[in-house]
Structure formats: structure tokens, C-alpha cells
Swiss-Prot record:
Gene3D superfamilies hit by this protein: Tetratricopeptide repeat domain
TM stretches of this protein: none
Repeat region (TPR), residues: 27-62, 63-96, 97-130, 131-164, 165-198, 199-232, 268-301, 302-335
InterPro entries in the cross-refs: TPR-like_helical_dom_sf, TPR_rpt, Ycf3/AcsC/BcsC/TPR_MFPF
Stored PANTHER family: CELLULOSE SYNTHASE OPERON PROTEIN C, TPR REPEAT-CONTAINING PROTEIN MJ0263
PROSITE patterns, A to Z: TPR, TPR_REGION
UniProt-listed SUPFAM superfamilies: TPR-like
Protein's recorded name: TPR repeat-containing protein MJ0941
Lineage summary: Archaea, Methanobacteriati, Methanobacteriota, Methanomada group, Methanococci
Pfam families with a match to the protein in the record: TPR_11, TPR_12, TPR_16, TPR_8
Organism: Methanocaldococcus jannaschii (strain ATCC 43067 / DSM 2661 / JAL-1 / JCM 10045 / NBRC 100440)
SMART domains the record matches: TPR
Keywords: Repeat, TPR repeat
Length: 338
């Protein structure tokens, strides 16, 4: 036991008094990087930065140390410092597309999409099928409203990954924004050929068909979402109810309204639809209660004010009708219900 202690002390003394060489510095730098990696993995960012700085004192151009430092700084929220670190790394090694993507993300997080785009283009110039760079580039282009470039980017990605359903859906969404409904519909049909139960594709197809005036086809999309796939998105339910009312499908409309109100009891649109439904069924007192609920939730909702006025007029309550017609006129610039 004593012998072992002496040996350990001896080797410890040798380490303390060894002559420094480039090889020794490199090995020690590697050891510090490994320690930094472990601390970073465990979420100890301060310790990770300590070890990575120790490594960089020994090897200032140690690529992995700089990369880990950039990661740790970005995890701490020190975005500017992280960008500086990654750019220092790029001054030594500019051919790594992953580094360009990280810098691009940091510029994006700081709101500088123009610089982010430059970084993603650099990454794609090195690796032209780098999917992460493409996806991040599309986010920037959409944020900047550069839709023509965005569509080119989608098309390029789809030449490499033609079965990538989310990209077909995103392309359709942009085409819809541009008013190119038929082209958008082609993209959604392609997405649904590849994945018949894709929720986003079905929802967007329903929205698109509704905009195109194809109410029955649109309703089938929302019904499939809600009834077959059990997707209880409140927006999908609202769309379905509005289509049912337009198609005079009143029985199903009431069922869907109740599904929606179970999810969100204070949904203004659904309470308004319920009032409209009861009004059509001749249940005027029930309709008035629903419209009153709408006004309680959103006092400036003109359609509800007008609907109450209309019912009072039908019932011969002219004084109440005039009151609500006047309220509607007074609130015409305050309405948030349209």
C-alpha cells in the first residue's frame, strides 16, 4: 500500500515538474475538452466554459474547443459572444457546414435574418443537400416575405426528398397566401397521396377548398379530421360548423358546436354559430341567450348586436330592436368579431 502511495507521489511530482512540450499541451487540451463536453452534457455550463477556456489557453485554434464554447455560450443565452466564438472557429475552418448552420441560427435568434441567410447559403454551398440548412433557410425567407425565393427553396428540397410531406404542406401554405389556390391544392393532394391521414394537409385542404367555394368538399376534410382522426382543433371545428350552416346541415352543426364548447366554453364564434342555429330552427329565445353570451364575452361584436336587433324586430319589440341597432352602429369601429 505504501509502495503504491510513493509511486503515485513520484508520478505526481513528475507531472508537476515536467518540461512542457507541444505534445503535452495538446494532450492536456484534449483532456480539458473531454471534461468540458461532460459538463456541457450534464448542463453545467459554467464548468464547461472553464474547461474549454483552459483548453484554448493551451491550443488557441482547437476547433472542437471553440465549437463547444460556442454551444455553451448559446445555451447560456450569450448570443453575441457565441457568434463571435463560432466566427473565430470559421476563421480557422470555414468548410464545415454545421458551424455555418449554428451561426445562422444564432443570427436568426437575434433577429438578423439577412445574416442568417448568408450563413445558410454558405452551408449549402459546401453541402448542397444539407436538409437542416434548407429548413432554416425557408424559415428566414418566410419571415422576410421573400415568397418567390422561398418557393424555389421548397422546389429544390423536393427534388432531393420528393416524399417529404411537411414540405409539400408548407409549399401549399405559401401558394395559398399568394392566391395560387389550384397550385396549392395540387401540393396538398400530393401530400395526402403520400400520407392520407396527415392532419396538417387535411386541415389546410379544408381551408383552401372553403376559400374556393367548394363547401361540400371542404366539409369532408374537416369531418375526416374531427370524426375519423379524432382531431379536436378548435379552428377545424369552427370551420366545420360554418360550412354546415352554409350547407343547411343543421343537425350535425349542433353536434359540432357542442364538441367545440366542451373544449372551450368561452369561444365567441361557436356561441354566435349556436345563436344562428337556434334562430334558423325558430328557437328565438334560445338564440337570444346565445347572442347575449357572445356580447358578454365580446361587447363590440356587431353581428351579435344586429342578430339580437333582428330577433327583437321579428318579435315586435321595436324599442329593443332600435336599441341594439343603435349599439351596432356605435360599435362599428370597435368590432373584433368580423
Amino acid at each position: 500500500m505504501i509502495d503504491k502511495i510513493i509511486i503515485l507521489y513520484f508520478y505526481g511530482d513528475m507531472r508537476m515538474n515536467r518540461k512542457r512540450t507541444p505534445r503535452v499541451d495538446t494532450l492536456e487540451a484534449v483532456a480539458n475538452v473531454l471534461r468540458a463536453y461532460r459538463e456541457l452534457f450534464e448542463g453545467n455550463l459554467i464548468k464547461a466554459l472553464y474547461y474549454v477556456d483552459k483548453a484554448l489557453e493551451l491550443e488557441p485554434d482547437f476547433y472542437l474547443a471553440l465549437f463547444l464554447k460556442g454551444l455553451a455560450l448559446s445555451a447560456k443565452g450569450e448570443i453575441k459572444e457565441a457568434i463571435t466564438t463560432f466566427e473565430e472557429l470559421l476563421s480557422y475552418e470555414s468548410k464545415n457546414p454545421i458551424t455555418w448552420v449554428f451561426v445562422g441560427q444564432l443570427y436568426g435568434m437575434s433577429g438578423n435574418c439577412d445574416e442568417a441567410l448568408k450563413c445558410y447559403n454558405k452551408a449549402l454551398g459546401i453541402e448542397n443537400r444539407f436538409l437542416s440548412a434548407f429548413l432554416l433557410k425557408t424559415i428566414c425567407l418566410e419571415f422576410l416575405g421573400e415568397y418567390d425565393e422561398l418557393l424555389k427553396c421548397y422546389n429544390e428540397v423536393l427534388t432531393y426528398t420528393p416524399n417529404f410531406v411537411p414540405m409539400w404542406v408548407k409549399k401549399a401554405e405559401i401558394l395559398r397566401k399568394l392566391g395560387r389556390y389550384e397550385d396549392a391544392l395540387l401540393c396538398l393532394n400530393r401530400a395526402l397521396e403520400l400520407k392520407p391521414h396527415d392532419k396538417n394537409a387535411l386541415y389546410l385542404k379544408g381551408v383552401l377548398l372553403k376559400r374556393m367555394g367548394k363547401f361540400r368538399e371542404a366539409l369532408e376534410c374537416f369531418k375526416k379530421l374531427i370524426d375519423e382522426l379524432n382531431v379536436k382543433w378548435i379552428d377545424a371545428i369552427r370551420h366545420a360548423v360554418s360550412l354546415m350552416l352554409a350547407l343547411d346541415d343543421l343537425k350535425d352543426a349542433e353536434r359540432y358546436i357542442n364538441i367545440g364548447l366542451e373544449i372551450r366554453k368561452d369561444d365567441v364564434a361557436l356561441w354566435y354559430f349556436k345563436g344562428e342555429l337556434y334562430e334558423r330552427l325558430g328557437k328565438l329565445d334560445e338564440a337570444l341567450k346565445c347572442y347575449e353570451k357572445v356580447i358578454e364575452l365580446q361587447p363590440h361584436y356587431i353581428k351579435a348586436l344586429l342578430s339580437k336587433a333582428r330577433i327583437y324586430e321579428r318579435q315586435g319589440n321595436i324599442e329593443a330592436a332600435i336599441e341594439y341597432y343603435n349599439k351596432a352602429v356605435e360599435n362599428i369601429h370597435k368590432d373584433h368579431g368580423e
